């Protein structure tokens, strides 16, 4: 799907995720709905990074309070994006990835080395003391395996359509660059076995750990030299700052272009930049307040936010690959999914143990297809559809040169 996103961004000149769907369907209502979903996703996502950064600061010996640490982090993130913009974070992400990969692999190897019996010893102890955290019970299957596998599928689809994903794709130089990155992406899975081993090692060696989110830092602090702990902390801190910076910049652009701009008859470049900067700063401030004042409430909000963001997947799939998609159909489907998420999570209703977001997305897709089949694309939608599919049909060398 990533090359299709890049093609649409190239043709339409889109700068944000809602821009794509405004261009494709010419619907301001759809644009605003997608923008609201993006903002609801990005705010708790930023708050989660602040919480992670606060955990890192506790392990590097900074004698500052949780609140002060988060405030300093917000100031650094704002200065960072004000100076560097979006492309510099894309470059620095390479350094972040190298540091994080090295840290996770090192942590996993240390866990294997320090446990008698290595990997088998770690899992033998985990099964003996925490069997419920190692094995998924077969019965009742609707409350265990069905939920786990539907959640895996749902999250995998959601990763394709987050607003951050669109932002990173738009900054790529060409469609070939996107394809090369997709070839490399599976290599990131290399670190997960080491991360799992490290997590279970901490589970069996530090059973009374108060904050499970700090398990990896606890492992490195207890088993690695100080300079290595510093490297791990640097990788984690850089990751948090990078995500905060890109998220805030993305949120500012979405608000100024796809919400504030929609309700203004004319917007100058100077006004748009001012609103973007103000919104970026406000989003950092709101995330800091949420991280400090309402950390427990945000756990539920993060869940709903991800459920909402993933509701964009059926619409995106239809937008890029189905000529018969109509503005009425995709809007009806997306709205159905958003409402279904709220109803299912608030009432705690489940169907066969499936992930509630997955159920909502299924309803979303069914409504979208049904309405699209009952309606016809208008002339403007047909024009954008023809332009998109004509561009995709070009020969590879020509497409790469554009």
Describe each PLM feature range.
Residues 1-402:
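Membrane-embedded helix-loop-helix hairpins and adjacent transmembrane boundary segments
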């Amino acid at each position: 799907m990533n090359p299709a996103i890049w093609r649409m961004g190239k043709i339409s000149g889109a700068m944000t995720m809602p821009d794509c769907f405004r261009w494709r369907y010419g619907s301001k209502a759809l644009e605003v709905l997608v923008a609201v979903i993006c903002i609801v996703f990005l705010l708790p996502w930023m708050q989660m990074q602040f919480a992670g950064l606060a955990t890192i600061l506790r392990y590097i010996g900074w004698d500052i309070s949780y609140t002060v640490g988060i405030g300093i982090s917000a100031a650094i993130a704002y200065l960072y994006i004000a100076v560097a913009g979006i492309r510099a974070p894309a470059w620095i992400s390479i350094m972040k990835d190298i540091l994080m990969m090295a840290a996770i692999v090192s942590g996993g190897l240390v866990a294997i080395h320090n446990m008698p019996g290595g990997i088998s010893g770690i899992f033998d102890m985990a099964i003996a003391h925490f069997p419920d955290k190692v094995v998924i019970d077969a019965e009742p299957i609707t409350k265990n395996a069905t939920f786990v596998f539907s959640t895996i599928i749902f999250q995998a689809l959601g990763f394709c359509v987050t607003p951050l994903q669109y932002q990173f794709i738009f900054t790529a130089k060409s469609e070939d660059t996107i394809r090369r990155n997709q070839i490399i992406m599976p290599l990131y899975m290399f670190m997960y076995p080491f991360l799992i081993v490290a997590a279970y090692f901490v589970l069996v060696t530090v059973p009374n750990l108060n904050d499970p989110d700090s398990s990896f830092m606890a492992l490195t602090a207890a088993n690695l030299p100080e300079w290595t702990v510093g490297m791990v902390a640097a990788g984690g801190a850089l990751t948090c700052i990078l995500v905060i910076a890109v998220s805030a910049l993305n949120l500012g652009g979405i608000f100024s272009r796809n919400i504030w701009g929609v309700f203004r008859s004319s917007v100058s470049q100077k006004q748009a930049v001012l609103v973007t900067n103000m919104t970026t700063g406000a989003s950092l401030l709101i995330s800091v307040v949420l991280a400090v004042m309402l950390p427990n409430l945000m756990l539920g909000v993060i869940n709903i936010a991800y459920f909402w963001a993933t509701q964009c997947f059926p619409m995106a799939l239809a937008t890029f690959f189905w000529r018969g998609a109509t503005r009425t159909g995709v809007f009806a489907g997306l709205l159905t999914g958003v409402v279904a998420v709220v109803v299912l999570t608030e009432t705690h209703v489940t169907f066969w143990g499936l992930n509630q977001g997955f159920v909502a997305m299924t309803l979303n897709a069914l409504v979208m297809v049904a309405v699209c089949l009952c309606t016809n694309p208008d002339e403007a939608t047909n024009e954008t559809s023809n332009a998109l599919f004509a561009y995709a049909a070009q020969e590879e060398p020509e497409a790469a040169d554009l």
